[in-house]
């Protein structure tokens, strides 16, 4: 007789956004907002094994900003990040996760020489680029479930300038970044009130988003299930759309 996963104690992690889909009662989400939008209170923040990321040079020269994410996803709003950079006198932006030219869409983003595109990068190349950045420009137009781009950037000492959607208000406090849904306010803040410490950003990521904490919190979830309880009283389900959030130019 075949047995399904439901016949065994189990925990399911949901990393993405869903709409109108009933999920397993033992679902864990990756931020408080992510959980609440699915009618749940069960979440564990993603944690990284920072030893895998190598050494961070907190005294490195930082003379550009960066965007990190799948630029082809409209909700990541790389165009918004480019517009922010272009609105700041002399600012340069390095786009990690996208190309200037796309065969299907042509010249998608900008001809500006102040904007550089690096495609999908990883390893030492990615670490080096993040370590030289003054900040992540991240004006997403959806409810971000978590955002590894945020914690990775913070680890390398780069503050986060983003929109107040999804997990961002939970992850980005005033010591490590600034959130707004308006381009002009983001530009004005970066130009006139940039006060961020690479050391503070780095230590915050190390202390709050590490693999040890994540493992400990998952163990608590596993113990709850092994004791015969479910993580949610009902099957979690999101009923409110998670995209098309506002970005004012």
Q: Can you describe what each PLM-predicted range is?
A:
Residues 105-127:
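Nucleotide-activated donor-binding/catalytic signature segment of Leloir-type glycosyltransferases, i.e.
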Residues 144-147, 154, 164:
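Short glycine/acidic-rich beta->alpha loop that forms part of the nucleotide-sugar donor binding site
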Residues 159-162:
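Short hydrophobic beta-strand element within catalytic cores of glycosyltransferases
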Residues 173-184, 190-195:
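Conserved acidic donor-binding segment of nucleotide-sugar-dependent glycosyltransferases
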């Amino acid at each position: 007789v075949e047995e399904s996963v439901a016949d065994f104690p189990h925990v399911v992690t949901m990393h993405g956004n869903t709409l109108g889909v009933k999920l397993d009662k033992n679902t864990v989400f990756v931020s408080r907002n992510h959980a609440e939008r699915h009618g749940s209170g069960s979440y564990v923040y993603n944690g990284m094994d920072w030893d895998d990321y190598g050494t961070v040079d907190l005294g490195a020269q930082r003379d550009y900003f960066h965007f990190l994410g799948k630029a082809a996803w409209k909700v990541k709003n790389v165009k918004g990040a480019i517009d922010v950079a272009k609105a700041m006198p002399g600012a340069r932006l390095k786009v990690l996760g996208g190309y200037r030219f796309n065969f299907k869409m042509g010249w998608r983003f900008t001809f500006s020489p102040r904007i550089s595109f690096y495609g999908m990068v990883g390893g030492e190349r990615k670490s080096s680029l993040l370590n030289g950045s003054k900040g992540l420009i991240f004006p997403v137009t959806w409810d971000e479930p978590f955002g590894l781009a945020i914690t990775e950037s913070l680890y390398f000492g780069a503050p986060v300038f983003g929109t107040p959607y999804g997990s961002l208000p939970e992850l980005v406090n005033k010591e490590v970044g600034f959130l707004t849904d308006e381009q002009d306010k983001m530009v004005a803040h970066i130009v006139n009130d940039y006060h961020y410490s690479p050391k503070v950003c780095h230590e915050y990521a190390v202390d709050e988003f590490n693999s040890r904490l994540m493992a400990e919190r998952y163990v608590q979830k596993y113990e709850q299930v092994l004791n015969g309880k479910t993580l949610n009283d009902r099957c979690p389900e999101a009923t409110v759309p998670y995209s098309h959030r506002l970005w004012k130019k």
